Amino acid sequence: MKDANLPMDKLEDKKHKIRPFSCLLLFPLLLLFMSLVQAQGNRQANAAPSPTPDGDEIDEGDVISVSTSEVMLPVTVRDASGQLVTTLTREAFRVFEDGREQSLSDLALRRVPVDVVLMVDASSSAAANLDDFRRAVEGFAAKLSPDDRISLIKFDDRVELLQDWTQSRVQLRRSLRRIVPGMFTRFNDALLLASREQLAHARGRHAVIVLTDGIDSGRGYTTLEMALRALLEAQATIYVVSNTEIERQKKREELDSLLASTPANVRFNELRIGDLREGLRVLDVSERNLAQLTAATGGRLYRPLSFDKLDATYAEVAEELRHQYALYFTPLNKKRDGRFRRVRVETTTPSNKVSTRIGYFAPGK
């Protein structure tokens, strides 16, 4: 088992350092990211593509990389009532890349193992509920296939890898006991490092499941759009179990209590009332950013009303991972130009809701 801090020196140069809570300025995140991608694409537009080498072998768990031309899309389908749809055939799907319909391969529905990075926000705001997280994760791990692997990262003042890839639930349980709380939240750094370091050694489907309020304290070097790009490059689906609603309830109750007191008490607590209102605004913006982050990667945002609900929430994520479709296609666009390509998946039932990532980066030269 590897027990080390993830290498912080592999982050971007310090010129990218951001101010506290600057992630709140990133909405709408997807528009900003797509503008950056478009700028990159314009710079590469005149580059001549390299020929595709012959004889590339594609193993069962392969996803798009420099060494393969086949693209794998993890796809979740829900009906109009929100229930998982698990019985579709290949003929029920249509896949589009940059608006152009693609042909699915014969291997469109094969079962692919999933490598899951479990991440926990161990900052002071979550310290009192780590036992609930440990219990929920153990239940989650028990519901995965024996072929699936798990790694564990905690983030606060530091981003720390507590458990490298393992199929051992015993090792995971031991690592969960080693989570100790810190003070601050390096959320963006944690996403970047999970994508570029941990998922670089993953196979099959890639998933990140994180418990957090999504509020980065701005003490790292990574912006939220940088983290999103890294997730898309790693072809990771992110599921966020957000405690924003739990924190919102606490702040609203305190704010309502203060506002209901006498005018003299309201004046006396004016600073605290202002802090609570600003805290609610920060939670709202953070939640919108988390919703865009999960939507862009084909994941899902969960907002349990109490930490007692974590067991059920993580069980729901495990259920979704067990019933994802793995759709494979070989792009009609053969250029190896490293550009971002938007994808869209539809089903023959218009009322179905299909979730997958917004696109992928083509192989480079």
Residues covered by each model-derived region:
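Bacterial N-terminal signal peptides
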Residues: C23-S35
